[in-house]
C-alpha cells in the first residue's frame, strides 16, 4: 500500500512529471507523484494545468519538461548553463520506469564500482577495476564529487579508443543528480547528464534524463541511443536490489573507496530527515 510523503524537503520542491512533447501526442497525461494520482492537461488556450483530485498544483515548463510540486516550492528549478550552449546536443534521454526507490537510482548513478561489471565494453572493463582516491564535499547544501579518472573503452558513441575519463558528480537535491564527463573528442571539455527522478511511490519511480553533449562527431540520435543502452543495463540491477527502499539506518561503514560517495549521500539524506523511499531509524 502506498504511504503518504511527509518529508517537507521533498514536498516543497519542483519535480519533473512529463516531457512537454508528450502533450503533442495526447492532450491529457495521467501519472503519479509521491503516491498521488495527478493529471496533466493542455487547456484550450494552450496553457498546461496539473492537478490532483482535490486541488490544482503549481506548474513550470523548463528544459522541455513539465514540473510540479505537491507543496509550496521554496527553491527554484536548478540552473543548467550547458542547456544554453549552442555547441551541444541538448535533448531528453527518455523516461524509464524503474521498480525501486528513486533514492536507490541516485546512489547507483554515483557508484563507480559497478561500471566495469555492469557496463563492460562501454564504461569499464577488467582488469581496470581499481578505484583511485577522490574528493567528496558538501558545498551550499549540494554534494560534489571530483578528482575522478576511470578507464573506459567506449565512453561515448564518438569514442574511437579507450582512455582515462575525467568524471565529476553533483547531487543538487535528494532526487536530482548530475554527471560531468570528459568528452571523447574534446577531452578538456565536459558532457553533462542529469537525472530528474519522479517518485511514483516509495518503491517505484520514473527516471527522466536530460543530456547536454558536445556535438562533435555525434548525432542527437546516437547520444540518446547510448544513454538508453547504458541505463537499460542498470535497470535489472536496480530492480533486483533488496530492499527496494534505501537503508539509512545506522550501520558500520566499511571504508571502501567506492563507498565513500554512498556514505556521504546517506548521511546527507539523514540530515534532511528524508524518510520517503528510505528505511530509517525513525
What residue ranges belong to the model's regions?
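Rieske [2Fe-2S] iron-sulfur-binding domain
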Residues: 2-90
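Short, Lys/Arg-enriched, disordered terminal segments
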Residues: 1-2, 282
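C-terminal catalytic domain of Rieske-type non-heme iron oxygenases
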Residues: 74-282
Amino acid at each position: 500500500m502506498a504511504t503518504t510523503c511527509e518529508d517537507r524537503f521533498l514536498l516543497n520542491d519542483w519535480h519533473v512529471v512529463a516531457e512537454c512533447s508528450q502533450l503533442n501526442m495526447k492532450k491529457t497525461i495521467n501519472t503519479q507523484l509521491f503516491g498521488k494520482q495527478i493529471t496533466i492537461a493542455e487547456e484550450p488556450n494552450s496553457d498546461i494545468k496539473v492537478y490532483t483530485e482535490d486541488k490544482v498544483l503549481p506548474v513550470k515548463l523548463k528544459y522541455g519538461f513539465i514540473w510540479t510540486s505537491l507543496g509550496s516550492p521554496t527553491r527554484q528549478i536548478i540552473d543548467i548553463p550547458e542547456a544554453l550552449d549552442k555547441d551541444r546536443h541538448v535533448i531528453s534521454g527518455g523516461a524509464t520506469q524503474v521498480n525501486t526507490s528513486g533514492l536507490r537510482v541516485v546512489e547507483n548513478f554515483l557508484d563507480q564500482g559497478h561500471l566495469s561489471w555492469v557496463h563492460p565494453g562501454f564504461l569499464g572493463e577488467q582488469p581496470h577495476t581499481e578505484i583511485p582516491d577522490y574528493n567528496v564535499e558538501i558545498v551550499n547544501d549540494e554534494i560534489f564529487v571530483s578528482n575522478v579518472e576511470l578507464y573506459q573503452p567506449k565512453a561515448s558513441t564518438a569514442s574511437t579508443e579507450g582512455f582515462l575519463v575525467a568524471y565529476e558528480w553533483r547531487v543538487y537535491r535528494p532526487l536530482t543528480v548530475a554527471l560531468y564527463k570528459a568528452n571523447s573528442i574534446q577531452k578538456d571539455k565536459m558532457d553533462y547528464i542529469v537525472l530528474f527522478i519522479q517518485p511514483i511511490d516509495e518503491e517505484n519511480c520514473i527516471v527522466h534524463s536530460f543530456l547536454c553533449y558536445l556535438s562533435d562527431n555525434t548525432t542527437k540520435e546516437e547520444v540518446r541511443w547510448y544513454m538508453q543502452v547504458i541505463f537499460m543495463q542498470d535497470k535489472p540491477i536496480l530492480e533486483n536490489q533488496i530492499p527496494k527502499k534505501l537503508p539509512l539506518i545506522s550501520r558500520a561503514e566499511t571504508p571502501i573507496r567506492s563507498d565513500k560517495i554512498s556514505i556521504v549521500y546517506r548521511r546527507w539524506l539523514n540530515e534532511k530527515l528524508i524518510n520517503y523511499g528510505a528505511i530509517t531509524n525513525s
